[in-house]
Amino acid sequence: MFILTDVTAGSKVFLPDELDVKQRGIVAISAYTATGDLQGLKQALKEGLTAGLSINEVKEELMHLSAYCGFPRSLNGINTFNDVLSERKSQGISDPEGPKPSKVADSGKYQTGKKVLESLTGRPESGAKTGYAAFVPAIDTLLKEHLFNDLFTRGVLDYKQRELTTVSALIALGGVESQLAGHIRICLNVGFTARQLEQAISLIEIKIGKKQADTGRQVLKNVLTSGN
């Protein structure tokens, strides 16, 4: 990774095409939560807070992950985070709370979720349902109303941060290449570069393993060469 160092201040300056320290923290927290490595997660949480993630940003990331690695992993992550905060407080470390989440609307949830998804993909959703949405319509409703409305409209994390969370979890989990490809396309649509995604994969290789990283690289390559 190319990093410029301010010699006088001793600080690292990340170039525009690099993941910044907060984004790298998001990647690590997501990957460790998804795989259930709570010891690794504990360290990643400390590093994420030190990198500038607020308490509420981390809470939102861990909640967001419930949609991708299940409530048990999400809840374990939340409990681990609570322990980390208690430990830091006992050490006299005060972490910023950060912005509070927005109130989620109870009405029009499906349409709001549909619009969020269209914004993420950059494509209008029209015509007859296909695939899983046609086979089990209720799961399409759940995705729109819960994931893309209840979670995405809470704010605190922007769309880029939420999608980086998602892609990192899917790479770490493995075996979900179809979904990973879709979310890599979304990441590219919301402003991430291929280089930044490659950096996320390299970080996951260090934290989680080469097998998961190699699969992530292949999926990224397939998306880039397909052009859609």
Please tell me what each predicted stretch does.
Residues 53-57:
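Winged helix-turn-helix DNA-binding recognition segment
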